[in-house]
Structure formats: structure tokens, C-alpha cells
Amino acid sequence: MTTAVEATAQVVEAFGKPHVNVGTIGHVDHGKTTLTAAITKHYGNFVAYDQIDKAPEERKRGITIATAHVEYQTEKRHYAHVDCPGHADYVKNMIVGAAQMDAAILVVSGVDGPMPQTREHILLAKQVGVGYIVVYINKADVSDPDMIGLVEMEVRELLSKYGFPGDEVPVVIGSALKALEDDDGEYGKKSIDKLMERLDDYVEVPPRSVDLPFLLPIEDVFSISGRGTVVTGRIEKGEIKIGDEIEIIGLKATQKTTCTGVEMFKKLLEKGSAGLNVGILLRGTKREEVERGQVLAKPGTITPHRKFKAEVYILKKEEGGRHTPFFANYQPQFYLRTTDVTGSIKLLEGKEMVMPGDNVSIEVELQVPIAMDKGLRFAIREGGRTVGSGVVSEILEWV
């Protein structure tokens, strides 16, 4: 299956433009889906409101999420855009990363101003590493102009509170419904043009995975007589070629080695790059010194850790999750990249227990260290079934 990052390279080739993943966030009924429909009408292949609202369900890491995917383009860029019909779907999508966002369009009603889900989505966007937010104040055609000014101030304060540059964030004022109805006024189609301009100018194109430091999660290890130890896996990012120094990280003490060969389907390659399933031959490394769950990485680019903070979503009973709540010191398995590791959960102040269907911040202490950095996604499993999903929001101890 093609990942979003691999797809980026293909999209640039297909459209001849840089690619950015965006999504709409914000409180229920503030107009996220109407705005999505309006953007497609003027910048893509039109997708009607009810088609977006009846988004098909996808399964990702054992969790079912309803997400609508649309695409559109400006003169400068190609955008893939995700919109979720329900609040629970937003929360799950942002944590599970079914559709990763480089930037979010925060939709706020000019009539109501920021509401509880507005806050929750901003906080989640920060926790899961969404880099940029552009604001669209909607329903301006039926709002008091003074009220719109207050809403903008409030939104900027809220963004600053949660770690975004509230003073710099672009704010566009308009009416998604007017734009959908082809209104030529300031709040109609012109507001969509302005929003697209702000996205183009404010949001930076993320680096492609192939330009990042090399990382390969180890899936299997073989010993080939006369040649040495081969590890296999899919290159998550970067490139590797013969002669490159690499580190083996996680589960035990970090080891240094050198790549003496890159193979794919029994063919020798000059180099392996992001997205490819390869075998890497390691110099002087014994079969028993390497195992599934470790990673190969460019030296000094990733370190092993046991303690971290995470933002998690716990599945409901109907989603195949737990039937009962859990309490502090609950010890499930954490499936990180290619392996399960047992860990203990600490609940943050004021939280006595976690119910199925909850979205919470937790602290985790794993029994063994795993190569990780902020933004790593994982599944929470119990007896082989997925009971939750999460994303690392902060590393708590440095080995």
C-alpha cells in the first residue's frame, strides 16, 4: 500500500507541482463540510456536501474511521484534503493518522465563535504535530461585523494558548454557503480564492521522506552462509547505499555497523530509498545480535526511549475495544512500528479512569527502550486485539 509520503513523490510527477496534505477541523456545524465542498467547486472536481458527509469508513490500525478524501489544486500546488463527518471520526483520524495533515484549515462560525470542539481540535492538532493552521471564519454573511472582530481575537488567543503563532496565523473571513452558491461578493467565491492564496503562501511544503535521514524498522533477520546477516524491512525514510555507516537501535544497547549490500527481490541495488522493501547486509553483525522491533538508522538521528507522553484514543466496545474502563498502572502491549512491547500507563492529574471511547493524554513507561521520536504512532493491544491507538506527543527521558 502506498503511503502518503510515497504518494507525494508520485503526485509531484503526476501534477508537476509540490503536494501538501490538508484537512478541515473545528466545532460541529460550523461549516467544515460546506467549506470543503465549496473549495472543490472552485479548485477541483466538485464534490457535493452530501457525498462528503456520507464518507465511507476505512480501517487503519484496527480502528474504523469515516473520512472523505478530496483533491484540488492552485496554480502553485496540489492539495489532498480530508474531512470527517463526525467529531469522533476527527479525533480518531488525527490520532491514528489515517490521513496525515501538514496543515489544517480551522473553521469557526462568526455567529458562535470558538466552542469546546474548536479547542479540542486545536490541542489535538498541536499534540499530533500539525505544522500550520489557517483560519476560516465562516457564516460572515449572517454575523454582526463587530462580533467577527471579537471572534478573530478570541481564535488568535486560543491558538497562542496551545502553542501556535496566534498573531501570525492567516485569518480569512467569508461564507462557505455563499461560495458554494457561486456568489461573487467578498464573502463568496472571493473568500475561497483568498483562503487558497493564504494556504499557498503560509504553509511550507514538507520535505519528502526520501530527503530525511535513513530509517528502516526491522521486520526479519536472516543468516546467509558466506555473506553474513541480512535484515529485511520497508525503508520508512531516507536512502541507504553500500558503505554507509548505520546504527541498530532499540530493545538493547545501540550497536554500530556498516551496510555491505542492498537487495530487493534477490537483485543487488546501488541504493535503497523510502518506500522500498529491501534486505540490508550488515558487516560483522551476528544473527543473534539483531531482532525484529529494532531499527536501522543513520547514526545520531534517533535514540531509544522508555518513557513518553502520548495522546490516545481508546476504542468503544462496539468498535471491538474493551468493555470496561481501565485505571492507572494498566499494562497493555504497545505496538510500535514492528513489535509489541509491554508498558505501564500513568494517568495525568484529575483523571481516575479511562472509559472506552475516551480520548486522553497519558504517560507510558515501556519495559524496554524503543527507537522513537515525537509523532510516532502506535496501537495499544491486549491479548492480540487492538484496544486503542496513540501518538507520541513528548519524550520524557533521554537515554
Curated annotation (Swiss-Prot):
Coiled coil: none annotated. Its main location: cytoplasm. One of its GO terms (cellular component) is cytoplasm. Its EC number is 3.6.5.3. SUPFAM superfamilies: EF-Tu/eEF-1alpha/eIF2-gamma C-terminal domain, P-loop containing nucleoside triphosphate hydrolases, Translation proteins. GO terms for molecular function: GTP binding; GTPase activity; guanosine tetraphosphate binding; translation elongation factor activity. Monomer. This is Elongation factor Tu 1. It comes from Wolbachia sp. subsp. Brugia malayi (strain TRS). The gene is tuf1.
